[in-house]
């Protein structure tokens, strides 16, 4: 396992190189050069100090195979630098020029049906194509040779959103690479046959040259889940290897500037194993796009909580988010008054030290013409650009106050996230195809906020032993080693909360035997003090069947009375001598499924700690009741406010952001205000009125 790269933050063109980075993707090659000076004038007006440049510019840099044109890039980098704006220079490989596809159509990826993924969009290339890699690395070296010592280029932006369009490649190149990957991973074909369970449906292989990728096999056919899980791992690894090849090609020439690439962690996107990717960058970056509705801020904070963990508590970079509406959803909602500033400051509240947008100037043409930007189609005399300017001033104020470099204070609760469990929940072979690990992580996160607490989101593979409580929502895959870690954590005094559909399979997608949840050859069952025989899956597939089952509290708290489950119920027996049943299934619907009186939520002492089993799905409101009663009963936080703390040895900053539509009255706030965005300071010391989408930041 490779060591993590050193943390290195790109410098700005300030006297000390410090400050909160602010800007966006800049695509000057979409515009005539007579626009560039006006762009820079507006950038200075808005307080922009950094741009990401040349992300989709390969065809402008290399118009034909034997011709290179750096002149336009030289000119814009000089203009930006002379204006005090640094460049995060892209490797420009996100989209290849059409001449390359015409000359070498074999570089195109293929879908599971064998069709080529044609050029014309982004990432229409196979990460396993040696031909494409040769051209891409030549480009990287050319860029490094020309700009490696340029003082205005302070960071390298590798690729763009790796995996957006080529996460799964079914080409012949991919097939050969997958066979080699399997050989490296398993060593022998017998070990691979064992891992994939190929005796089922007669899939045994005699050699690695018989290994297949999970191409289309017929409309009603199901892919071997072990094979598909390894193909997901392979796709992640191939893209990571491609990123590292690009990075290393530049680093050989320009080793002294930091490298990053933009992850995709937001509403419905967490497609890569970013716990592995985070080790290979000098600073972590993310593209975050907002979730419409009442959970807008909560989802942002949840995604950012994972980013903070991936960054190991170091500052991280918002590489892209939107000033207002995007253009790629069926319905694209704009942001309300204040949300452009509020969302950006919320990212800072969650540990970000850089706020960039897609993009600087709204495109006049192309697929993203109606995607919002810092400068909208209507120009500078707009509400949106004025908000951008207000944001720039706020970020400058925060930087002057000393926020940059402070670290986000952690919770005592960790919600564990597993990319492999996220991939596994997509399998067609599970009792329900409605499982979604990342959504369940988000629901638990919101429940802690609603209970007046806050949790961290931590990759399962990381060290979470310092927390008091760990929560596992739909963590389908648990290895024996990870199960032992959980048992050791509980035995040492920790609290483990295991959600439904957790610990059902091992890392090869083999079911753990002996009863559910069986992870660790029954160690998880022993820790929980329960043993499940079957799952009850609701879905109203048969007319007249109940769509939900009610729970009834089984202890004096009555906390879970009236809560309901609508998808998945574990039918378990309580086996622990000292296990306590906290809630049971109850009522006519439970009786219909022979679950009436069966344990739904339990608690079991284990060593010096305890383990909870939440054996059914619950919505956010019902999870909140559970969290408030058993997991965060002592919390004193105001559930109407997202409150975070960033601190260093020199200063502590408190951020307060209302979570809903209502104005929030805050009292007893210590410290001096730094930011009063849509916030009024009242006469009474420590009292503030924070309006909808407002932000209060105080230093103490």
UniProtKB/Swiss-Prot annotation:
Catalytic positions are 161 (proton donor), 320 (nucleophile)
Q: Which CDD domains match?
A: A4_beta-galactosidase_middle_domain
Q: GO MF annotations for this entry? A: beta-galactosidase activity
**Which class of enzymes does this protein belong to?**
hydrolase
pH dependence of activity: Optimum is pH 6.0 using PNPG or TOS as substrate. Not active below pH 5.
For this UniProt entry, what's an example GO CC term? Answer: beta-galactosidase complex
Q: Which UniProt keywords apply?
A: Glycosidase, Hydrolase
Per its record, the protein catalyses: Hydrolysis of terminal non-reducing beta-D-galactose residues in beta-D-galactosides
Q: Does the keyword Hydrolase apply?
A: yes
PTM statement from Swiss-Prot or TrEMBL: The N-terminus is blocked.
Description of activity control: Inhibited by high substrate concentrations (100 mg/ml). No effect on activity with various EDTA concentrations (0-1 mM). 20-fold higher activity when cells grown on TOS than when cells grown on galactose, glucose and lactose.
Q: Which GO terms describe its biological process?
A: carbohydrate metabolic process
* Binding, substrate: 122, 160, 328, 368-371
| EC number(s) given by UniProt | 3.2.1.23
Q: What does the record give as the function of this protein?
A: Involved in the hydrolysis of transgalactooligosaccharides (TOS). Highly active towards Gal(beta1-4)Gal and Gal(beta1-4)-Gal-containing oligosaccharides. Low activity towards Gal(beta1-3)Gal, lactose and Gal(beta1-3)GalOMe. No activity towards Gal(beta1-6)Gal, Gal(beta1-4)Man, Gal(alpha1-4)Gal, Gal(alpha1-3)Gal(beta1-4)Gal, lactulose, 3'fucosyllactose, lacto-N-fucopentaose I, lacto-N-fucopentaose II, cellobiose, maltose or sucrose.
Q: Its family?
A: Belongs to the glycosyl hydrolase 42 family.
On subunit structure and binding partners, the annotation says: Trimer. Tetramer.
Name of the protein: Beta-galactosidase BgaB
**Natural source organism:** Bifidobacterium adolescentis (strain ATCC 15703 / DSM 20083 / NCTC 11814 / E194a)
Q: Which gene encodes it?
A: bgaB
